């Protein structure tokens, strides 16, 4: 599915991932309608390329929902998130509640997580065949986009870049727990 992942374009990958849970549960805890954003970075030349991240959880979530979202997106429940990306997380700088606004519509993609993360996609990139992100285990083809801007302000992570590549797709996550 898609092109195989390889080295990041700049040797250091600075990223923001976002999720809008359309329909989801963690055990009996309803997570439908909630959102999460993860900002992070990794260095291709560092052994194992561990991710250093911050996780932002929808401020509308109650404490039980926040705990479930944290466990899911940091890979503590195993399953698809752990196999797709969370196993690469080496350090977590912060887990915070934030006002999250997402737009995942084609040609309108944007991510806002409080004052910590802001991303705007400028346009889709024409590709020959399906495109998949270099996230380990990623299994859904999607669309490559060029970013208008990607800004993260979560010490020690701080960057504001433009014209970088981005990736948009859907996800279907399941834990290893019943």
Identify what each model region corresponds to.
Residues 9-11, 47, 103:
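A generic structural signal for short, solvent-exposed coil/turn residues
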Residues 117-178:
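Extended, charged low-complexity segments
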Residues 29, 90-95, 145-151:
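Low-complexity, flexible helical/coil segments
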Residues 2, 39-43, 98-102:
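Short amphipathic beta-strand and strand-loop transition segments with alternating hydrophobic
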Residues 22-27, 50, 85-90, 140-143:
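Short C-terminal domain-edge/linker segments immediately following a structured domain
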Residues 17-71:
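Long, charge-rich boundary regions
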Residues 1-21:
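N-terminal ordered "arm"
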Residues 49-134:
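Charged linear interaction tracts used for macromolecular binding and regulation
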């Amino acid at each position: 599915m898609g092109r195989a992942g390889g080295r990041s374009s700049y040797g250091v990958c600075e990223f923001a991932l976002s999720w809008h849970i359309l329909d989801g549960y963690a055990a009996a805890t309803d997570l439908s309608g909630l959102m999460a954003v993860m900002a992070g970075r990794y260095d291709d030349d560092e052994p194992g390329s561990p991710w250093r991240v911050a996780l932002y959880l929808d401020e509308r979530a109650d404490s039980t929902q926040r705990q479930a979202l944290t466990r899911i997106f940091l890979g503590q429940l195993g399953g698809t998130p752990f196999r797709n990306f969370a196993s690469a997380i080496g350090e977590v700088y912060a887990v915070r509640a934030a006002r999250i606004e997402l737009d995942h519509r084609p040609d309108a993609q944007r991510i806002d997580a409080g004052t910590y993360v802001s991303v705007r996609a400028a346009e889709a990139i024409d590709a020959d065949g399906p495109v998949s992100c270099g996230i380990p285990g990623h299994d859904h083809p999607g669309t490559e986009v060029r970013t208008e801007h990607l800004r993260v302000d979560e010490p020690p992570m701080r960057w504001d870049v433009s014209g970088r590549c981005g990736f948009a797709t859907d996800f279907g996550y399941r834990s290893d727990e019943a």
